[in-house]
């Protein structure tokens, strides 16, 4: 059976996408513009009262059952573990789910210390405090990361990090993954 030109082109594109997905990559200008526009649209989440109040409550009184959580313990937990599911089933997790659109592949809200307050699905890491996706928003700025294959979703995505603001003060971060193929 002869191999068609379309098969070769399709295979080359798939290989190129997979090779590029293995590491961070630069987005085409038109995709960058779409990411910027989506980040601007999502910026209202920074002052969403449900998000702000949940982060303030968590910062004031972190749940005792998570005070000893480590990255290693977190990675060992199943997505079905009740302590993991609590983050997607809590009121903020449900609020995030209601806000999700077809372009959002993941979303998590972190407290000032980088630990989780809520998410759509289990994150790869328990704390992102040392990552730019949390540090930049905690400085009151928007973070837009490179396109990369996300470990938790398995999709090529760009992460947008926004500050959670109490007035003008950053008190936490929101990281929203945008599927590159969905933009």
Give residue ranges: language-model regions.
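Helix-start (N-cap) segments at beta->loop->alpha junctions
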Residues: 176-183
């Amino acid at each position: 059976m002869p191999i068609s030109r379309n098969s070769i082109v399709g295979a080359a594109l798939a290989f190129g996408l997979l090779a590029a997905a293995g590491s961070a990559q630069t987005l085409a200008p038109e995709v960058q513009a779409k990411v910027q526009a989506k980040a601007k649209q999502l910026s209202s989440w920074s002052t969403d009262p449900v998000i702000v109040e949940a982060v303030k409550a968590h910062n004031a009184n972190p749940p005792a059952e998570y005070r000893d959580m480590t990255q290693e313990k977190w990675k060992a937990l199943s997505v079905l573990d009740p302590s993991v599911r609590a983050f997607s089933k809590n009121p903020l997790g449900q609020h995030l789910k209601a806000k999700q659109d077809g372009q959002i592949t993941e979303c998590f809200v972190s407290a000032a210390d980088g630990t989780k307050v809520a998410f759509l699905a289990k994150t790869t890491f328990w704390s992102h405090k040392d990552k730019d996706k949390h540090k930049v928003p905690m400085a009151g700025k928007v973070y837009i990361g490179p396109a990369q294959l996300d470990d938790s979703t398995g999709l090529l995505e760009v992460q947008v990090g926004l500050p959670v603001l109490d007035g003008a003060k950053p008190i936490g971060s929101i990281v929203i993954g945008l599927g590159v193929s969905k933009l």
